[in-house]
Structures are given as C-alpha cells and as structure tokens.
Curated annotation (Swiss-Prot):
Organism: Shewanella halifaxensis (strain HAW-EB4)
InterPro entries named among the record's database cross-references: DUF480 (IPR007432), WH-like_DNA-bd_sf (IPR036388), WH_DNA-bd_sf (IPR036390)
Lineage: Bacteria, Pseudomonadati, Pseudomonadota, Gammaproteobacteria, Alteromonadales
Protein name: UPF0502 protein Shal_1801
Transmembrane parts of this sequence: none
Family indicated by similarity: Belongs to the UPF0502 family.
Pfam families, per the entry: DUF480 (PF04337)
Amino acid sequence: MELTPHEARVIGVLLEKEITTPEQYPLSLNSLTSGCNQKTSREPVLSLSESEVQNTLDDLTKKRLISEQSGFGSRVVKYKHRFCNTEFSDLQLKSSELAVVCLLLLRGPQTPGELRTRSNRLHEFHDVSEVEATLNELQRRESPLVMLLAKEPGKREARYRQLFTEVDDTEIQSTPAQSTEYSITQHASGLEARVNTLEQQVAELTEQIKHLLDR
C-alpha cells in the first residue's frame, strides 16, 4: 500500500477522528479539510484547499481506501476510511499499533518517547517500553509498516517513520559494523543485523566445540 503525502494526511485524520471524536465521524469534506490543516498535532502544517482534499479523496477512492456515506435526507457526503480494521481491509491493527501508525502519518518521524507523550487520546501506553514493543511488532511484520531512521546528530533517540509513503534514500539507516546487542534486540534493525548476530553465535559455538575436542 503506497500513499502520497496528502493521502497519508487524509488517512491519518480519518483514523484520528474516528477514535477521538466518534460522534463526528464519518467526516464531511469541510471537516476533513479542517483536520488536514490543523495548526496543532500536525507536522508539517499544511494549507490544503477543499478542491485539493477532494482530489486526494478521489485518488483514495480509486485505491479503495475510503468510502462515501450519505445520511438519509442529507445532501452532505461524508467519508470514512477502509485503511484498516474493516471488513474491506487487508490490514488489521491492534489499538496500540493503530495509535502509532496514526501519529506517524500525521506528524512524521518521531521517537518512542514522543509517540508515548502524544498518544494519550488514541491509546494509553504505560511506558516507553510498550511503545518500543509496538514499533518492533510493526517492524517485524512480513511487510514492515515502520522503519528506524538514522539518529540525528546531537540527538539521544533515533526516530521511526511509517512506510506507507516513499522513503528518501537519506532517511535509511545503515546498520553499523559494530552493532550492539541492544540495538539489534530492541530495534530489530534489519536483516543484516540479524545475520551478523547469527554468524557471531555460530563462531562462538564453533570455538566451544573446538575447545571440547582439544581436551
């Protein structure tokens, strides 16, 4: 499933409002445009016109990721997502996973700490380790939904991004040659890291067997 940045924003808004303001969901074009252009909880802040949002909705309809709904006696068309957790969706997410994906769609790359702080209206994470566990689950899927980015200079924590929109080559984290056990187990930083770990274990076992045979 590939999304443009505008499609990601629209899907993110629909996911968010379904959870935080269910009484207003599905959303009209006007409400959806306002949600896309919010000054808070959005990175980057956009200024989309209703026609731009409508064009994005048309594209999402072609991808079968949204559906229209008209109330009885109302001419206002409202929109709901088919992105995940519906009978029409291949993608099924737990509450914790949905919260993380929603935040990454709406606010771009974030650290586990930022995700925990910003997720209170979507899902209650008791600590950062729960966020990290959720990120690892999303990263270990057959088709990963998130990835770990290279740590920014001067930053203590690395950020994660969603994989529904195109990834720039500069964002991809290369696995260090001296990868630590913590980074491997906690962040599952790709196939190369896992292969390196297995090779190290094989080398240790070979050394142990050799030591036993030499006795």
